[in-house]
Amino acid sequence: MIRRIILTMAFLASLSLSAKDVNMGSWQIVPLPQQVKEMSSAPFRITAKTTIYYAAGDEKQKKDAGFLASHIKEVTGIGVKTTDKQAKGQIRLALNAGDTQSEAYSLVVNKNGITISATSHVGIFYGIQSVMKALPITRNVKSVSLPAAEVTDAPRFAYRAFMID
């Protein structure tokens, strides 16, 4: 009898040691981006005060920001707003001039926010997809976190297709 009690207590203790923060996202997503460099700094917390910034007058970015906001609401229950005014603690969508592939994107996540940058709207959309996949699926919480990281990705091929032989 004492042996069963000791085994039960040991089992319960081992469960508490392996418990993870279910409100923490992960960059182990499919398909895995070309480069994921996780940082040891503090994660970014998404709360009801978080906003998604898009460039004023850019209707495509505004639509993408709304898409991301609705997904965050759906999977976490946290209502984030979109805005064309910059502030701290935002998820920023940024178009940058550059010579990278049109569908390439980069993400920078730190305690101050998330920046999704690309040379085209398509790249921003794919960056948003990566953020959506990294979010934890949990409901009715006050905040979720994404680990600090630098993520870079681009399509491996210049075309997307499905072939059946």
Regions found by a protein language model. Name each.
Residues 2-8:
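Sec-dependent signal peptide recognition
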Residues 1-2, 19:
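Extreme N-termini of proteins with methionine-enriched Sec-type signal peptides or N-terminal signal-anchor
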Residues 9-18:
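Hydrophobic h-region of N-terminal signal peptides that target proteins for export
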